[in-house]
Amino acid sequence: MTVSTHHDDSPGLSGRLRDLLHHVFGNQKSPTVYPNAPGNSAKPVPTGLADDIDKLGFKDIDTLLIFLNSAVKGVNDDQQFLLEKMIQLLAKLPPASREGKKLTDGLINDLWDSLDHPPVASLGKGFSFREPDGSNNNIHLPSLGAANTPYARSTKPLVFQNPNPPDPATIFDTLMVRDPAKFRPHPNKISSMLFYLATIITHDIFQTSPRDFNINLTSSYLDLSPLYGRNHDEQMAVRTGKDGLLKPDTFSSKRVIGFPPGVGAFLIMFNRFHNYVVTQLAKINEGGRFKRPTTPDDTAGWETYDNSLFQTGRLITCGLYINIVLGDYVRTILNLNRANTTWNLDPRTKEGKSLLSKPTPEAVGNQVSVEFNLIYRWHCTISERDDKWTTNAMREALGGQDPATAKMEDVMRALGMFEKNIPDEPEKRTLAGLTRQSDGAFDDTELVKILQESIEDVAGAFGPNHVPACMRAIEILGIKQSRTWNVATLNEFRQFIGLTPHDSFYHMNPDPKICKILAQMYDSPDAVELYPGIMAEAAKPPFSPGSGLCPPYTTSRAILSDAVSLVRGDRFYTVDYTPRNITNWGFNEASTDKAVDWGHVIYKLFFRAFPNHFLPNSVYAHFPFVVPSENKLIFEGLGAANKYSWDPPKARAPIQFIRSHKAVLEVLSNQKDYKVTWGPAIKMLSGDPATSFALAGDEPANAASRHHVIAALTAPKQWRDEVRRFYEVTTRDLLRRHGAPVHGVGAGPRTHEVDVIRDVIGLAHARFMASLFSLPLKEEGKEEGAYGEHELYRSLVTIFAAIFWDSDVCNSLKLHQASKAAADKMSALIAEHVREMEAGTGFLGALGKLKDLITGNDVHANGNGVYTNGNGVYTNGNGVHTNGNGVHTNGNGVPHAAPSLRSFGDQLLQRMLSQDGRSIEETVSGTILPVVMAGTANQTQLLAQCLDYYLGVGEKHLPEMKRLAMLNTSEADEKLLKYTMEGCRIRGCVALYRAVVTDQAVDDTIPCIPNKDDPTFARPLSNPQVAESARTLKLSTGTRMLVDLTTASHDPAAFPDPDEVRLDRPLESYVHFGLGPHRCAGEPISQIALSSVMKVLLQLDGLRRAAGPRGEIRSYPASQWPGQAGRPPRDPAWSGLRTFTSADQSAFSPLATTMKINWEGRGDL
């Protein structure tokens, strides 16, 4: 493109330019020129505005305006060619133009400001991961903030301070000590759990050396050093040295052992989260970045493997840690947890550069100061329960002495001995008297009990006279430390952080008693020491939102500034916190989701540490920083109390697998003793009317619903032909629409590629549901319609997953929220269509019915077009799917159409509406919507796995299958159906939950075992010792069962030669659609749908996988994380169940999401 430089002499141009340039540059005088100046000082005589204006054109006004606008906004739309136009403008000006020089300077400044100077990130190996001691955070100042370096000073102390300050013991006894009879609960009912995290944060960045108070033994970064250690030796002590794991339920800090047990239990959750993370990282192995050695003697390779996993796992765990700090801790501090808002104070905000502002620096490092060491001493918030625990623990350490009266020297000596007696090996330490189990971990139920009691424990309030007496020696030491540091006064510090100084003792604290004591000790507010002053300050009142922590006024402001500095200054939380550094999955796993809990994220920590104790919507796991009773009031006010469970955590019994075909059939056929578990989810999605839907229960009403649905689905005689043709035509259309040539040129055959799962199989089923139930789809290039095709597919999968695949407790609430929103939208659209259908509205609908009566033709009318079998023109709910030119052809000029099933669907809806005379809304939510929910996801899953089998292990069958597909006869189609069902049986992975409602015993066997030669664990072997594997399972009431249809499909007792494709198996023998009273009601339709899509795919010339990982389905043996690494699986036998990942591998998925295929062709299908 050439940008014109045409000179525009429009009237008034000179005046407009002169005004603009005067506004930008001002009216400056030319400098005086001296004729006898030194030779090297001569400068060209600058030209003025008049000369500039003569050179410029009308379009240059726009260029200057765009330049100014870009400078103010900090964003340059390069499609406007601003840079090129500025160069053209500058090139027109005289060489010595004064204004031209300023514009050039501005352009250079803009280009300079586009980059960091100096850079804040580096590709050096020494900067990839956190160092154990925190060094190398700032790549230019590697020791900044490292452990074992001096504290910083924030505030210059200028005020003359009394050389004889008040006695520390007197300060404590008059301003700080708590009267045991006058405990003040926190005004916002914050639980002790928040202050346990505060304790971890404090000891993460402040650990004063007992030998030199000026030295900080830990780093100045929030890097979880209490868990990981402060140096290399401490870090190696908590690591197993294998697979990136930490030793089970360990943490580095000895000091934590001396705190209430909830602090240690909190750290153990981070330990377990870390081990969960590295286990999943190794499983996914994104891009092959974690190279597992192939030989046991490759010592260096194993060390690299372990370290890469450990360091990446640490970055991810710290990422969750900082998101908990910002998303849960800071939100509670600001009382945002009481407001219906997702706003949060997140220092990692992305600021743009502009003329009016520059972004706050980031990744510059940090060095904590002595002032903030004092700010973070919050002993007044110790609860009554923890006061008693601490007093007893200190009394025991003191040999029976009361810590409230013991000398400071005795207390320090006793605490030193206490820490000395703690084993150096973290795995040998205990917590609250708990005993380690054989796997090295503590008992989950006992840890959960500690956490539950801590969540229910109301913390203390801030303010004077509220520090437990047992902390007397600790507080006296703190006052003495502050004096050795020569810190500034309270007022000096307040001025430093931008607050007004206290002008009176009353301003500091209106309590007359406190005022009198302060006046006696310090004479003037300006003389009050920082630490005693903070402890004596009044606490802020609650504001909702605004003030939730309610600390002293100075603390309230200071901690927010410090939080911003700690996070924004940390390279690993800013410029290097990227999916590339911590993997897509790791980035996603640690991230907050504003759609869940308003951005709170601590539930991930609870659920990964204790997956079998907290319900998916437990308020204990989602909001532990406020006691449950107060949370109940908060959520009632927000109208969200019914979203959460208020029951205390409780261990759930392990899931019992049922594996053999005989046992599977026995369980699935018995509705009396084994009940389906889908009812609550179906009710959640569709409301009370859905409780009688076929799959929602095992009562007579559910059975009646099943019979009604089957009758409605299969009543039309022509339904098989309708379904078959729909899927064949639709599949061709999707291949044409989404396939693209990737090799070859010219008019000859070219290699095409398509994501067959995402863009063909899934969308074919989604289109079927849209056409059948008149869900309006958006046409290509248009905005009309309620759904894009992929959007509808995702909605259907999400709804299905909430009912049948809700197995990840951590993501369950998010899944339920998303599925509920999708179901509500879908229900409303279907109900609207049903009402219009019942009213008989729509001209084309009436015309179609009339034509049907007159001609007897098979007429399908929708809202926008007509299909007749004589003309072959199809439309869906909104029109014709075309390739952009309006018509698809098969090469012979015959139009390809996107067929509609609307009349078939409308008849189906009419039949469903006839049930029991229910209202439209009741029928839609109770029958129609559940039918829609049940269709797409499972069919996509089965066909994807079937195709995967035949493009891999079963490829020897492809030539015969392709031959059959090309015959296009009913006999050939029947054989293709058998091939399809066999592929689904061999590679499909299906299981169904059941609940035991009466004590039972089931005889079961293990029909197949893992194949050691198959690293994917997808191909089992028949168990040669199946008779010896016989066992009787004692099932008590309440037991959850997973009825494994995958193992049943590989049981030789039911399927001889289970690993071979055999076409002599009866269609009714297959179990991947279920067995018994709840066998899939839509199985006949599904069979035709699957085989029809498969048929079209087989007709592709040269059908094959795309090369490399793109052509493979990434899957892993399904297993439930047991809460800690090293625990043996509850049922180690082969299950055949698989888990998958999203296409970008950022999340696990219950079904395959992507697989690319290639074929040869000219693009016509």
From Swiss-Prot:
Source superkingdom: Eukaryota
Keywords for this protein: Dioxygenase, Heme, Iron, Isomerase, Metal-binding, Oxidoreductase, Peroxidase
PTM comment: The N-terminus is blocked.
Binding site for heme b: H203, H379
Positions that bind Ca(2+): D204, S219, Y221, D223, S225
Record-listed heme binding positions: C1080
Region (Fatty acid alpha-dioxygenase): 104-448
Complex and partners: Homotetramer.
Role description: 7,8-linoleate diol synthase is a bifunctional enzyme that converts linoleic acid (18:2n-6) into 8-hydroperoxy-8(E),12(Z)-octadecadienoic acid (8-HPODE) and then catalyzes the isomerization of the resulting hydroperoxide to 7,8-dihydroxy-9(Z),12(Z)-octadecadienoic acid (7,8-DiHODE).
Name this polypeptide is given: Linoleate diol synthase
UniProt source species: Gaeumannomyces graminis
